[in-house]
Amino acid sequence: VSQQYDVVIVGAGFTGLTAAYQLSKQGYRVRVLEADNAVGGLAGTFEFADGVRLEKFYHHWFNNDIYVPELVKELGMEGDVITLPSRTGMYFNGRMWKLSTPLDLLRFTALSFVDRVRLGLLVFQVRRIKDWRSIEHLSIRQWLESLCGQRVYKVVWEPLIRSKFSVYAEAVNAVWMWKKLVLRGSTRNDKGSEELAYFKGGFGRLAEAMVSAIEKTGGEITLDAKVTSVIAEADELKALRTARDTVHGKKFLFTPAFPIIANIFESAANAEWVNSLRRVNYLGNMCLVLRLKHSLSDTYWLNVNDPGFPFVGVIEHTNFDTPENYERTHIAFLSRYLAVEDEVWGYSDEEYVNFALQHLQRMFPDMDRSWILEHRVWRAEYAQPVTERGYSQYVPNEHTPFSNAFISTMAQIYPEDRGTNYAIREGRAIAKTIAAQLDK
């Protein structure tokens, strides 16, 4: 019989790695199985031709996040954190607007003065809501229009919601937006501008530091190990199957997206429960990373409020982390959320770059194809869970039909939205639950 682990964890994103780290630190025998060829999940990194490292999908954290900095400190890597006031802006009606401070808002003449005031007061109205359940039955549009009117919604919010949630724009409940506004309102420093933090070389480096820490304490991590099914007896799981291996364990934790977990359990669990996992919808993301000779603008995070623009925004990473760290080149991310049924999902990398370029040149007329030194296109099928109205009523919890198997995944972080900070929080919480069971 092959050896039995105390805990077998599926997925080496931040939730899986955090749980593995906590448990192996306490002396449990842990094995992590990751389908991909690298750790970090959506926060994984890649290298350009000259070895410059970067994220596949951009991440930063806010100055009110607590779990990431705690972890960074514990791993002794505080020196790798870069913090800067963020420079955010908006592209609307063919021009750029700065939107980093209250004063910028007053200059936003695309809205009437009354509407600017309504937009400015929104943060205060939002803070008055203490119980998110009271707005869970509303769509984002219904809720925001009631607070700041149709014109503000149309100009400022609708293009962002549409580019973020694509075909699900009318389905997502208001809690998602409420959470975003409350959080962003609390991340400002004493001058009223927002502070953001980034990890040198990308969050994937932090994930790799966790791998080293897990291995130091005797834990194991196996890459290219896609779990295909489970072996169960009565109400207990005994083992997981991968293409090469059968892995036995006492406790099991599943951290991928619900549809992936549903496929793994398909033949072993009751259909009603498996279908409940499939009830949660997801959007995919295509992220284009451009390495450029020249800078596009001086804004880090440019929201594009132009109904014809197919990306949620232009994130010029080197307006946050200095170009010196990238051999004096400039890095821009273009992110698009879409249903995987969308024809754009099937574009080749080359088609996607051409598609992006025609839109970028409309915004930045000086930009030329010769600016692009290198590019990469990354695709994530389950990038954003869609939290529809009444989501808390149907989202599956951490339990499975098997007493020794648990789920902790991005779609359960609700009412918060996804993020590395919460992945770490959830990984710690589920590790506690599992440790308590092992100690019985």
Where are the regions that the model predicts?
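Conserved Rossmann-like nucleotide-cofactor binding loop
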Residues: 15, 38, 259
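Glycine-rich FAD pyrophosphate-binding loop
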Residues: 24-49
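FAD-binding beta-loop-beta segment adjacent to the flavin cofactor pocket
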Residues: 321-327, 380-407, 411-414
